[in-house]
Every structure is written in structure tokens, then in C-alpha cells.
């Protein structure tokens, strides 16, 4: 009986160690990929998903901006509206480049800085709003929020999707647009609130277009 109790006690201890080891400095329990919380830097997170981020990693290094993502730079917490590898590869094809490093360093730095906010910004922090084309290259912003990026300014807003024919009964969608490019079209976030220890990633849709920024 004593041996059995000892075994049970050890099992409980192991479970407790696992639970506490999964907790991060933000006080949440890391559930891994399923809930978008990762107890690692943003830079380390990118390396766990080569399909979506391998070209992004190369672009960041080529632009000399790695320190923004690994926590060693000026900002310890950022929000990155992440352009994925597929968007980058399409840009290569459209512009006759063979490799990410063929893109001018200045261009890489410019587009990345326009997609980085120097603070942690969650989906829940962005108010409801809209941005509508009101003729030609003119867009009108409704509610939402203006947000300074490392370069330029963004307009952010959320709205509720319809669900099974019921208006505004679905999930919350995050959108953004550049306030620096006349006639820039709206961009949609495909996956929100990917949390890391150095900030938050909101992954842009695969059809993201460089020209809008």
C-alpha cells in the first residue's frame, strides 16, 4: 500500500511540474499551437512553421530587423501584421526576382516597418469599425482606430461576420489598411492573437498585396 501511495504521489508531482512549467510570465498556461499561445520569442515561433514563415524569416534578416523579433532590440513587445511566405513568393514572381534576397534591402525594411506596431496589440483592443470606398481612390474610415507603426500609420478595425444567415452572429474579423498610400485597399487578417514572449502576430491573408503599403 505504501508503495502504491508513493507512486501516486510521484505522478501528481510530475503533473504539477508540467502545469507550472507551462505557465509564462504573462500568467497564462501555454496550450501550444491550438490556442495561439507560445512560450518563446516571435523569432523562435516563426521557425516552428516553415510553411508560412520561411520566406518571412529571410526577409527580416535581409532587412536587418531580426532584433525586433527576438527581443534584443529597442522594443521588447511588438505587434506584427505578418506577411506570410506565400505573399512574398507571389511578389517575387510578379517582379522577376528569384530569391527573397534579390529584393532590395530598403524595400524589405520599408514594408516590414509599416507592418510593425511598437506595442502589444490584441484583437480585443481594436474597436468595431469599417473603411469603405466612397469613390475613385477615396476611402472613408468609420470608428476603428488609427495606430502609428514604426513607419507610417495604420487604420485598424473589427467587425462581426454573419453566421448561417444570421447577421453579426459569427466570429470577429480584424482588418487593416495603410494610411500612407492613396487608394490603398483593405487587408484582412487570417489568424489573430498568436502570442509570443516578445509580442503578438496577426497573420495576414495569403492574398496580401505589397502595393497597398
List PLM regions with ranges.
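Sec-dependent bacterial lipoprotein signal peptides
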Residues: 1-23
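Mature, structured domains of secreted/extracytosolic soluble proteins
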Residues: 23-213
Amino acid at each position: 500500500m505504501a508503495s502504491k501511495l508513493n507512486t501516486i504521489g510521484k505522478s501528481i508531482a510530475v503533473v504539477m511540474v508540467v502545469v507550472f512549467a507551462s505557465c509564462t510570465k504573462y500568467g497564462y498556461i501555454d496550450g501550444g499551437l491550438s490556442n495561439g499561445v507560445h512560450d518563446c520569442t516571435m523569432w523562435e515561433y516563426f521557425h516552428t512553421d516553415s510553411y508560412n514563415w520561411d520566406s518571412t524569416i529571410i526577409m527580416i534578416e535581409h532587412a536587418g530587423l531580426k532584433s525586433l523579433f527576438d527581443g534584443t532590440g529597442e522594443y521588447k513587445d511588438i505587434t506584427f501584421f505578418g506577411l506570410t511566405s506565400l505573399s512574398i513568393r507571389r511578389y517575387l514572381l510578379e517582379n522577376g526576382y528569384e530569391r527573397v534576397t534579390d529584393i532590395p534591402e530598403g524595400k524589405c525594411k520599408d514594408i516590414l516597418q509599416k507592418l510593425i506596431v511598437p506595442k502589444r496589440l490584441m484583437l480585443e483592443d481594436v474597436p468595431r469599425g469599417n473603411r469603405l470606398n466612397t469613390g475613385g481612390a477615396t476611402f472613408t474610415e468609420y470608428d476603428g482606430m488609427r495606430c502609428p507603426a514604426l513607419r507610417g500609420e495604420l487604420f485598424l478595425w473589427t467587425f462581426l461576420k454573419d453566421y448561417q444567415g444570421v447577421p453579426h452572429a459569427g466570429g470577429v474579423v480584424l482588418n487593416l489598411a495603410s494610411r500612407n498610400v492613396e487608394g490603398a485597399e483593405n487587408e484582412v487578417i487570417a489568424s489573430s492573437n498568436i502570442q509570443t514572449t516578445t509580442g503578438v502576430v496577426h497573420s495576414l491573408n495569403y492574398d496580401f498585396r505589397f502595393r497597398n503599403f
